[in-house]
């Protein structure tokens, strides 16, 4: 079996999570999760941020080191 990673999707440029407003099944999160640059298998909205499952180990998830989304 191949172990898959899961976590909050994060914007590599600033360390911010992908926001969402419709909790649970969420087309936006699912699309972002399955995007070629992310490589996930399923995404949904959890606590107003996109959670992604089935990610390759190479895909970064929140939190990113040295990038705190504008917070100190």
From Swiss-Prot:
Its main location: secreted. Keywords: Amidation, Disulfide bond, Ion channel impairing toxin, Neurotoxin, Secreted, Signal, Toxin, Voltage-gated sodium channel impairing toxin. It is found in: Secreted. GO terms for cellular component: extracellular region. PROSITE patterns: LCN_CSAB. Disulfide bonds join 16-69, 20-45, 29-50, 33-52. The keyword Secreted applies. Residues 5-70 form the LCN-type CS-alpha/beta domain. The keyword Transcription does not apply. Expressed by the venom gland. Residues 1-4 form the signal peptide. One of its GO terms (biological process) is defense response. Has the structural arrangement of an alpha-helix connected to antiparallel beta-sheets by disulfide bonds (CS-alpha/beta). This is Toxin Cll8.
């Amino acid at each position: 079996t191949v172990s898959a990673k899961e976590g909050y999707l994060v914007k590599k440029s600033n360390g911010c999570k992908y926001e969402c407003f419709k909790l649970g099944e969420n087309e936006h999160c699912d699309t972002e999760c399955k995007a070629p640059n992310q490589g996930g298998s399923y995404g949904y909205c959890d606590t107003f941020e996109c959670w992604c499952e089935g990610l390759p180990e190479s895909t970064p998830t929140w939190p990113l080191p040295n990038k705190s989304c504008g917070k100190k």
